[in-house]
Amino acid sequence: LCPQNHVIEFMTLLVILKISLAGLFFGYYLKEHFEKNHAAISIFATAYALCGFSAAYAWDIMWLDCMMLAPLVVLGLEQLIKEKKVLLYYISLSLCIISNYYIAIMVCIFQVIWFVITWLENKETGIGAWIRFAIYSLLAGGTGAILIIPEAITLGASGSQNISFPDTMEW
């Protein structure tokens, strides 16, 4: 993909791209959520992109994927509840799970909390919102399972299979 002597520059470019897209996607989320195009959106989008998480984990670029996709997942969830649109939620959550299932677990926990809060504000959507949320969350998880299950099988068959905690601790 890139010459060996430019790997560091390529990785730096990827980090910059992911952090920039995180800010862009968060700005888009704020614009759609509040239905306003205000100058403060740029400030908050920049603050999100340059938050402590991105600074602390820029060395592990996989962890930036879910940070980048999280605003789209939340926007997709809001569209799923309010407008019965499911595509953005399904695609962004699937990509989040595929890109890094560890951070995606935290995103999914947040989605459950955010779903309940958003649904309580929009109770008129009824039980249909719950059904859509469950179905498309499970579909996104199933889509992610295409990679997660083979990874789990491979890890189970590797040398790390027999690693366990010690029975006793001796001081």
Locations of regions flagged by a protein language model:
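Perimembrane helix-loop-helix junctions
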Residues: 107-139
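Membrane-interface transmembrane helices that cradle and orient dolichyl/undecaprenyl
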Residues: 73-88, 120-121
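Juxtamembrane segments of multi-pass membrane glycosylation machinery
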Residues: 1-13
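Membrane-interface alpha helices of multi-pass inner-membrane proteins
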Residues: 87-101, 139-142
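Transmembrane-helix motifs of polytopic, lipid-linked glycan transferases
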Residues: 13-34
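Short acidic/glycine- and proline-prone juxtamembrane loop motifs at membrane-interface regions
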Residues: 58-64
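Transmembrane-helix signature of polytopic, membrane-embedded enzymes
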Residues: 27-50
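Periplasmic/ER-lumenal interhelical loops and adjacent helix-loop junctions
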Residues: 1, 129-171
